UniProtKB/Swiss-Prot annotation:
Transmembrane segments: none annotated. GO terms for cellular component: cytosol. The lineage of its organism: Bacteria, Pseudomonadati, Pseudomonadota, Gammaproteobacteria, Enterobacterales. Belongs to the esterase D family. NCBIfam families: fghA_ester_D (TIGR02821). Keywords: Hydrolase, Serine esterase. Its EC number is 3.1.2.12. The active site is at S145 (charge relay system), D221 (charge relay system), H254 (charge relay system). SUPFAM superfamilies: alpha/beta-Hydrolases (SSF53474). This is S-formylglutathione hydrolase FrmB. It comes from the Bacteria. It comes from Escherichia coli O1:K1 / APEC. Pfam families: Esterase. One of its GO terms (biological process) is formaldehyde catabolic process. PANTHER family: S-FORMYLGLUTATHIONE HYDROLASE.
Length: 277
C-alpha cells in the first residue's frame, strides 16, 4: 500500500493509502486513522462506508471522528465507494456507476467486470488491513446512506465477522425505493430475487440476525420518506425480536452536519462492543 497523504490528528495519524485491488481490478484509495496507541499495540477496527457521490475523503475530512477514535483506541478504515478509473464503467448520473457502488457484487455487464464492492469490503480490504496495520481481528462496521445500507447488509450476512453495526440515514429497503431499484436493475438484472440479498429488511425477514442495530435518522432529511424508510427497519426488527437503538432527530438533514453531531456516540457504541471479551 502506497502512502499518499499523512496528517497528524489528535495524537495519531490520518493517512490515505493507494493500492491495486484484485477484487475491483483498479487502483483504490482508502483512508486509515491510526490512533496514538497504534504505535505500541494492536487495536480493533471500525470500517466506515460512505454514501452516494462520496469517496474516501468525505468521512475523514468532515466527520471529526478522529477525536473519538483516538479517545477510544480504534483504527478507522474509510474506503472509497466504488471502483475508479477511465477503464471502469460509469454512468452520467450520481446514483449509478463511479461513486455509487452500492457495496454489492454486480452480475450484469458492463458492471460485473469491476463492481465487486461486497467482496472488496468483506474480504480483500480486511486482509490488507490485518497485513499492513496493527489491527486485531475484531472489527465493526458503520456507514451513511448508501454506506449505511452496505454496513447493514454486510453485518446481517456475516454476523460472526462483525462485532457490531450502526448506520446513519441508511437505505433500509432498497428493493422498494428508486435509488435501490435503479441500481439493482443495472447491477443485478431484472430478477428481483437477486436484489433481496442486498436488502436489509428482506434479509431480516428471511431470518438473518445480528445482536443489535444502532441507527440515527434526521427528520429534516429530504430523502427520509422516499428513499430511506427507517421505520421499515424498526418494524421488522420488532417482529423478529432484534434489539435496536433507533433514534430520530428533529431538525437534522442528510448531510455531514448530522453525521458529525452524533459520530462520537457511534464510535463509543462500537468501542464498548469491541472491547468486550
Amino acid at each position: 500500500m502506497e502512502l499518499i497523504e499523512k496528517h497528524a490528528s489528535f495524537g495519531g495519524w490520518q493517512n490515505v493509502y493507494r493500492h491495486y485491488s484484485q477484487s475491483l481490478k483498479c487502483e483504490m484509495n482508502v483512508g486509515v486513522y491510526l490512533p496514538p496507541k497504534a504505535e505500541n499495540e494492536k487495536l480493533p477496527v471500525l470500517y466506515w462506508l460512505s454514501g452516494l457521490t462520496c469517496n474516501e475523503q468525505n468521512f475523514i475530512t468532515k466527520s471529526g471522528m478522529q477525536r473519538y477514535a483516538a479517545e477510544h483506541n480504534i483504527i478507522v478504515v474509510a474506503p472509497d465507494t466504488s471502483p475508479r478509473g477511465s477503464h471502469v464503467a460509469d454512468a452520467d448520473r450520481y446514483d449509478l456507476g463511479q461513486g455509487a457502488g452500492f457495496y454489492l457484487n454486480a452480475t450484469q455487464a458492463p458492471w460485473n467486470e469491476h463492481y465487486k464492492m461486497y467482496d472488496y469490503i468483506r474480504n480483500e480490504l480486511p486482509n490488507l488491513v490485518m497485513h499492513h496495520f496493527p489491527a486485531t481481528a475484531r472489527k465493526s462496521i458503520s456507514g451513511h446512506s448508501m454506506g449505511g445500507l452496505g454496513a447493514l447488509v454486510l453485518a446481517l450476512r456475516n454476523p460472526d465477522e462483525y462485532v457490531s453495526v450502526s448506520a446513519f440515514s441508511p437505505i433500509v429497503s432498497p428493493s422498494q425505493v428508486p435509488w435501490g431499484q435503479q441500481a439493482f436493475a443495472a447491477y443485478l438484472g431484472e430478477n428481483k430475487d437477486a436484489w433481496l440479498d442486498y436488502d436489509p429488511v428482506s434479509l431480516i425477514s428471511q431470518g438473518q440476525r445480528v445482536a443489535e442495530i444502532m441507527v440515527d435518522q434526521g427528520l429534516s432529511d429530504d430523502f427520509y420518506a422516499e428513499q430511506l424508510r427507517t421505520p421499515n427497519l424498526e418494524k421488522i426488527c420488532q417482529e423478529m425480536n432484534i434489539k435496536t437503538l433507533i433514534r430520530y432527530h428533529e431538525g437534522y438533514d442528510h448531510s455531514y452536519y448530522f453525521v458529525s453531531s452524533f459520530i462520537g456516540e457511534h464510535i463509543a457504541y462500537h468501542a464498548n462492543k469491541l472491547n468486550m471479551r
